[in-house]
């Protein structure tokens, strides 16, 4: 048909056909096609250009995205396909070939439209969803299936595009499996400014259709401006002849954009159409189809999503804030209770609340949406879900518990979130997409949870809890192999005790809540006891012992120094009120050394024999020492320090198997709470045992290990510290102190100051007795040194 055009007809009738002014404009065979919109001066055809224009191939018109004659709806399934399925597919790395219609001319596929009779792409489906083109979700799903089928039909199975389509189709089917089962039409809520919104919506729909249609027609890449008569009148609202569009586009494309679009969108709403006309200019002036579609597709969703956000707030806000409205309807008592609980939100729980808000935010919605709501096993056809998953968990439940202040600490919050992820890993196969989504979301959670701030210490109201964790943390810092587990146990114990105190203070809680909390606390205590038992039974490394020895040595030196200072103060005390004492000693004429020694114990008595000295010194020594105990009952009830408990635990572990039965018997006899426990599997927590029980255990263990019982006022020397180095150090220290004391005595031996000599010698003897007593549990070398030092002190004073 194109060959019938003769040269003498071209100057007149060619222009007429081109401008749509002659009768040939409507004839399809006489239409002259334009290869590109970028060439200027196309209106003056020549003989050379006519055959090139006539032989250029053409793309068929793209599928319609809006049809006023065909009614559309907004349903829950269509909204799910738009917000979830389309969003996930559109952002996928393999989605780029499917975002716009196949350009057979640009890609050099002349047979594409002969094989594929019904082209489809995701850009068309997306615009149809935005324009409410579909009546039911099945129509949209059919379009998706058509798009994938076209790809499989035209391409070879080994092509990359086929693999990309298969990946997208797999994601599509997985998303559709989570779609609501029953399709329900959503009521479109009209906002307050309904007139403006209605006009804006109508103008928006008109401008969107023209925006997508005009660039689609004008952007058939480098081929021809094909304007089909039945298509344009339905989309461009008030233009009767398609040739009117083509003529200004051909004459001046850059200047014709805004007037054309303003005219086309004028009947629905002129002001908005003008605004859209500005955007249309940017669309039509872009040279390539990809450049046209790329601004077109992001530019249209903001306009189309804006009214949808106003019309359909439940789906937009459902995942973010589902609980806030019911909280306003709570009774006053519950509101007061919640407000009181709100005040007790700790820093760590505030951090957890921020993590929860981030998990529910739009930033992570692409892979977090399966975890927003509880798994509806019946709707999804997962009949074995609740048989496999015994404790379901989801983010809405976590949010509800957080708002109701059901979490007492960050560990409970983290346990629920991790339970949700572990349920997903447990039920789904490892290669499932929802598992990958869970792992991605868990990475976000763990990264934020690792930045948990430390809880500030509260020294005032909890003396027990503040005393215990340092001990536990001390043990964890000393042990190199079991550091992390002991730290976690100490934190859990501290939180448990804080929780117990909170339970006592919150008298308004119901009995059911108390029972529930007590049960949870008992479970946590049981877990902590298991950890402590495992820690106490674990091997202790040698560096730990060395560190302990150094610490013990420092403590012992400090204690001895304090004892010496106390004795010196006691010596200084009696000196002041006795100035006339030297006169009495002069009158007595007892200037010998024996009199000084004998008069020392009684502080002023002149009689007595030397064999009474040990008894008197024993009687007078306890009042000088501040840490002594008067009776055995006080000794039994004296609380154990952390080091003593730890040493007792080590000693019990050293006992042979046949001796452990007696240990269990002692504990069960003295601890009512452990009487009903199984003797074979009893767990000993030294922090909960009475001091009397611990002392009885200590006596029994020492008797089994054949150790000497410690005196009440001495610092307990741990087992395994009888090395020669320590003995030599002690010996040197004792000798040095004795030399100091004897030197002081020798320098102050003058007749008028016998009373001061007596007090100095008494201080010396008390110090010697104290030092020898403190080293009584040491080896023979240290005991012999202490006895020899006491002999030398006696000889010096004699």
Swiss-Prot record:
Disruption phenotype: Embryonic lethality by 11.5 days post coitum (dpc). Before death, embryos are smaller and exhibit abnormalities in the neural tube where the gene is highly expressed. Mice with a hypomorphic allele display severe obesity without type 2 diabetes and are protected from inflammatory diseases. Predominantly expressed in the testis, followed by ovary, placenta, embryo and to a lower extent in somatic tissues. A motif (Nuclear localization signal) lies at residues 553-557. A protein binds at residues 111, 154-156, 159-160. The modification Phosphothreonine is found at residue 6. GO terms for cellular component: chromatin; cytoplasm; nuclear speck; nucleus. The modification N-acetylmethionine is found at residue 1. Residues 542-564 have a biased composition (Basic residues). It comes from the Eukaryota. The keyword Phosphoprotein applies. Residues 315-331 have a biased composition (Basic and acidic residues). Residues 480-512 have a biased composition (Acidic residues). Residues 73-179, 343-452 form the Bromo domain. Keywords: Acetylation, Bromodomain, Chromatin regulator, Chromosome, Nucleus, Phosphoprotein, Repeat, Transcription, Transcription regulation. The modification Phosphoserine is found at residues 36, 297, 300, 304, 631. Changing residue 427 to A: In BD2-m4 mutant; reduced binding to histone H4 acetylated at 'Lys-12' (H4K12ac). In m8 mutant; abolished binding to histone H4 acetylated at 'Lys-12' (H4K12ac). GO terms for biological process: chromatin looping; neural tube closure; nucleosome assembly; positive regulation of T-helper 17 cell lineage commitment; protein localization to chromatin; regulation of gene expression; regulation of transcription by RNA polymerase II. GO terms for molecular function: acetylation-dependent protein binding; histone H3K14ac reader activity; histone H4K12ac reader activity; histone H4K5ac reader activity; protein serine/threonine kinase activity. Residues 630-712 form the NET domain. Residues 1-21, 53-72, 267-348, 454-645, 736-798 are annotated as: Disordered. Residues 284-297, 772-792 have a biased composition (Low complexity). The first bromo domain specifically recognizes histone H4 acetylated at 'Lys-12' (H4K12ac). It also specifically binds histone H4 acetyl-methylated at 'Lys-5' and 'Lys-12' (H4K5acme and H4K12acme, respectively). The second bromo domain recognizes and binds histone H4 acetylated at 'Lys-5' and 'Lys-12' (H4K5ac and H4K12ac, respectively). Belongs to the BET family. Homodimer. Interacts with E2F1. Interacts with (acetylated) STAT3; promoting STAT3 recruitment to chromatin. Interacts with CTCF; promoting BRD2 recruitment to chromatin. This is Bromodomain-containing protein 2.
